[in-house]
Structure formats: C-alpha cells, structure tokens
Amino acid sequence: MIDKIQDKKEISKKLKERAIFEGFAVAGIASISGSSRIKLRTNALERWLSNNYHAEMKWMESEKRKNIGLLFEDAKSVLSVGFTYINSQNNNNNFLKVAKFSQGEDYHKVIHKKLKNIGKWINLEIPDCKWKICVDTSPLLEKAWAEEAGIGWIGKNSNLISKKNGSWF
C-alpha cells in the first residue's frame, strides 16, 4: 500500500490522468473524512426526507446515502468523474424533442465500462486497493461527492456545474 504522502499525491495524480485517458472530461478525488460541505448536503437530504418530499421514492431513505461507510466499508476516498454527453448526433426532428443525455448508448453502461477499466488499472498499480463502481444508481450523494472532489459545484438548478463543461456532464 502507499505509505508516503508524496506517493499518495502521485497515485492521485496518476488516477485522475487515467480517468481523463479513459475519456472522462473531469476527475477529482475527495477524502471520505469529508468536509462541512458533505455534512451540509447530508443535512439538506435529511430535511428533504423529513418533509416527505420524496413521496413514494422510499429508496431515497437508505442510510447508505447518508453514510458512505455503509456502502463501502473501509473506504478512504472517492474518485468522482464527469462524462460529457454532448455528442455529434443532432436531433434534427422538428416534431419530437429528445433530451441530449438520452441520445446514443445508455450512459450507465458506457461509464461503467470506463470505470471498470480504471479499476483494472488500480489492480495493477495498487494491488491491495479495494474499489467499487457507482454510476448514479447507487445510494450515494454523487453530486455532493463530486463537488467535494472539486470537479464542479451544485448550482441553483441542482445540477453539478463545471467551469469547463457547464452542466453538460
């Protein structure tokens, strides 16, 4: 395992570079110890749930959503990535309008494959490192962790926004 601080910084740098190599537009790493920002986002979720704004979506109540340690025991950090969904396919249909993110292959599959490639790379670089893939179907505050990782901020529209890509990821 990596013991020296400089080694941790180096592997973090290489990991983000690997994510960019795999086709992600942005990548950042957040420490699980979190910050006041994660606590604020978790508190906001708890208020939202207590007001029953989630209605029938009982899956939103998962404790794993509030405590990443329940999702992946012994986790130390989160790699957050952003994948742009602007593509060359144009919706020239003037009758039907289709959301950009839904044009093309299912992004869950595309992103999962790219993250799995990063996982294989991790296995080679840090053999004793455990990892788990979460693509926005896991009980994880993914936007809050991405914000904590520094790849963007959560805007008034509740989307994650980056300086480079806006909210197109």
Regions found by a protein language model. Give the residues of each.
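Auxiliary alpha/beta "docking" domains used to position bulky ligands
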Residues: M1-F169
